[in-house]
Amino acid sequence: MNPTYDEILKANSLRGNEIKKTPLIHSPTFSDLTNSEVYLKAEFRQKTGSFKIRGAYYKIKSLSEEDKKFGVVAASAGNHAQGVALASSLENISCTIVMPKNASPAKVAATRGYGAKVILEGINYDESYSKAKEIAKETGATIVQAFDDPQIIAAQGVIGLEILEDLPDVEEIYLPIGGGGLAAGTVIAIKEKNPNVKVIGVQSKSFPSMYESVKQNVRTLTGGDRTIADGISVKMPGEITFDIIKNMIDEIVLVDDDEITKAMFLLMERM
C-alpha cells in the first residue's frame, strides 16, 4: 500500500527530539554557476549524517512490543545501517545489519558503534538484502527496509514538508535516487502542497535502475559493480517507490562518477 500525505503528517508529529528539522543553506557558488538561487538541504546535520535516520526511527518506533522482542534486521551500504542501529539503540532492541563487503570502513565502524551486529555479505545492496531476508526468516526479526516500506517513505517525505515551510516559493527540487524512498516520500509531500513544483530525481549512471524502470514502465534490473555513490548502488527499485515515482516525478537524470566526484569536491571547497 502506498503511503499517503496523512501518513507523512503522522510521521512528522511522532519524530520527537531525535530527528532534527535541518536547515536550507543558501549556496552562493552553486547559485552563480546555475544562474539561479540554490539551497542545500543539510541532512548531514542529522546525528547519523544522513536523512536515513528519519525512516528508521519512525518504523522502529511504530513496532509492536511483541515485534520488538525479536529485534530488527536491515541491509544497507551505510547510511540506513547507522539509522537503524541508532533507532534500535534508542528503543533498546537487538539489531543486525548486513552490509556489502565493499562498504565504507568508516560507516561499518559507525554502525557497530551504535550497538548493531554487523555482517558483511555481498557486493551491493541487493545481495546484502538477500542475506537480511534469510536472517529474518531464521530469527523472526523484523526487516527494516531501506526504502520500499510505506512508513519509511512517509518519514522521508517529511523533508518535503520542511522544504516548503522554509522556502514556499521553491520552483525545482533535485533528489538522489537509489531505491527511491527519499524521492517517493518527498514528491508526495511536495505535489500535495504545490503540484507546480518540479521534482527531479538524480541517479548514478552505474546503477540507473529507477531511470530504466520508469523509461520501460516496468521494474528493471540494472547496474554495475560499484559507484562512488555507494549509498545509491541499487540494482532494482522497490515496488512501492517505483509506482509512486513513475506516476509523480517530473524527470530523472543520470550522472557519472566523474561528475559526482567533481561536485563533491566543489561542495567541500566552495559550498
Identify the meaning behind each predicted range.
Residues 1-271:
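PLP-dependent amino-acid enzyme catalytic core
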